Structure formats: structure tokens, C-alpha cells
Amino acid sequence: MDVAALVSGGVDSSVVVHRLCEEGYKPAIFYIRIGMEDEDGYIDCPAEEDIELTTLIARRYGCPFEVVDLHKEYWERVVSYTVETVRRGLTPNPDMMCNKLIKFGCFEERWGYQFDRIATGHYATTDLLNGKTYLSTAKDPVKDQTDFLAQINFAQISKLMFPIGHLLKSEVRAIANAAGLPSAKRKDSQGICFLGKIDYNDFIERYLGKKEGRIIELETGKVIGRHQGYWFHTIGQRKGLGLSGGPWFVVKKDIKRNIILVSRGYDPDTQYGKTIEMETFDFITEDAYEAGYWNREDATPVTFKIRHTPEFTRGLLYKGEKGYRLESEERIQGIAPGQYCVIYDEDHHLCYGSGMITKGR
């Protein structure tokens, strides 16, 4: 079986190569270059260090290694999506789009199709049910990345291998140390993948600029501060508002008037909601309604996430003529339109897919 391994130079993907070789595979190693650089060299991404470490791994295990450049595709499909989503006052998820469109999209179209399986360092697993592959959660609940993979499709999940998904992060580190891998002591990457060392707000300012507006207390209608543009703020945001007497939370945005509405939380109804609406929902393996597993006339008990945290929330999923509605068992803070709601089974093991949030209340 021919296997391609997507390697970043970090400890997780390095251990992937180590384990594949231990199991008798000789994977072809690929490093995807996606770091952004405009005409001014604005974006600083540590690609050279990544490539150097990946080269060492490839040499050690005698694996073929290729650097593939998807810079242009990444700009056109992921970075532009991020900027446009923010411009519309919504909350983007560029990491989710990167997996769907770049790592398992463009790469598959140009290189991956030559291989039987694609291995990555994601913390996730798969299960085979009724002859079909399902995305499943990882052993490590803190590192689990299924929410970032919840927009991929059946063709993509069917080819994927997650060699470290059944390990805790501490176990991955221990394997790397025992094997003497060059990335064993390397820190985990943080933040959005294309930004490198660049601050997110600096990036947004570069492409959307600044526009001063009012910060208004929702309950009283009083102007209590100024902001530099609604696009710098997301629903549920607590830090970076520059207000005293808090904590303050962003609860609404008036896009047309460039107004940020905030609350200190003494009225929980302004901050928390139980209803999530989605116009569409993308199943990874198969549509559970069409397959007959779920009945559109009944509520389906599920667990879900609306942000990258170890915790799952219970709820009931409904399918109607105009889309999908999720009723949460408990009130949740910061339901942000544009973000994705990721749906799991009741045991938060199988990940069914995700839908973009259009409204929360």
C-alpha cells in the first residue's frame, strides 16, 4: 500500500512518520508550503525551519521528500475566505477550510491521488461502520481536532490515516524523545496557520483597515467607548475592548452602523442562548436522514461544539424545510454566526459533520 505523509516539522507529524516506518510502510513525505508573503514580505511564516526538520526526518527513515507549493491556492481559497467572512461581520474558521480545501483538496488533486492512503498528525481516529468510514474523536480530549476536520467529505475521510489519534499528547512526546526525533522538544504551533508570527488584528487591519465606531452598552444604550472597526471583534469576545469596570462581553454587532454592543452579563439572556440555526449541514460520511438512521419528524439527541474546546454540550437536532435547528440542553455563550457547529453522537465519539451557524438565540 502506497502511503503519503503530510509532515509539518512538528513533533506530531514526525511521530507519524516514525510509527508508519515501524509498521513496515515507507511513506512519501510531503511538506505543504502555504505561508503567506505579499509584495512587502508582510507575512512571516517559519517555513524554512519546518522544512529543515522535515528533511532530517526524511533522511533518517530513508523516505522520499517533496516540498509542494500551494501558496496561491491557499490565498485564493482560504485567506480570501477569511477576509471576506470578517468583512461581513461573521466569524471565520480558516483552519477548517484549510483541511477541506488545501490539505485534502488541492493536495489530493495534484499529488495525493497517486497514493492509497494519506497520513497526518491530526488528533483524530476513524471507525468502520456498515462498511463505511466515520471520523471519530481522539484518545486525548484536550488535543482532539475532529472539529477542525468536520467539513471534509466521504472521499477524503476514506483515505485518511491518523497514526497518533489513539495516543495522548504526553505519549507522543515520549515516543519522540525515546526515538531521538529532532522535533521532540519543539513547541506546538499556535494560532491560525498562515499568519506565522503576525498578530491576527494586524493582519485584518492590513486588508480591511480601520474605521472608528461606538461601543454601546446593550442594556442602557449608553456609549461607553470607541472601537476601530467591527471586524476586529467577535461575538463572545471578552479581551481587547479597552473598557473599565468589566468584564465586558461583545453580544451583538451592528454591521451597517459599525456599532459594537456589549454587556457585563447581569442579564444572561443577552449573552447566552440555547438555539442554533443552520441553513445547511454537511455530513461527512452520509446523510443520516436519507440513510434512514435519523427521522426528520423527530428530534435527534446529539452532542456538539461551537468552538475548539475539550467540552461537549448535549442537545436535540431538528431538520425542517428551511434548514437545521439545534436546541442546546444548557445555555451557551457566544453563538457566533459564520462559525461552524460540529455535531457528534451522544457519546461524543462519532463526528457526523458540521453546519455554518446563521443565527443564535
Swiss-Prot record:
Residues 93-95 are annotated as: Interaction with target base in tRNA. Residues 143-145 are annotated as: Interaction with tRNA. It catalyses: S-sulfanyl-L-cysteinyl-[protein] + uridine(34) in tRNA + AH2 + ATP = 2-thiouridine(34) in tRNA + L-cysteinyl-[protein] + A + AMP + diphosphate + H(+). The record marks H122, Q339 as: Interaction with tRNA. InterPro entries: MnmA-like, MnmA-like_C, MnmA-like_central, MnmA-like_central_sf, Rossmann-like_a/b/a_fold, tRNA_2-thiouridylase_MnmA. Its main location: cytoplasm. One of its GO terms (biological process) is tRNA modification. CDD domains: MnmA_TRMU-like (cd01998). Catalyzes the 2-thiolation of uridine at the wobble position (U34) of tRNA, leading to the formation of s(2)U34. Belongs to the MnmA/TRMU family. This is tRNA-specific 2-thiouridylase MnmA. It comes from Porphyromonas gingivalis (strain ATCC 33277 / DSM 20709 / CIP 103683 / JCM 12257 / NCTC 11834 / 2561). The lineage of its organism: Bacteria, Pseudomonadati, Bacteroidota, Bacteroidia, Bacteroidales.
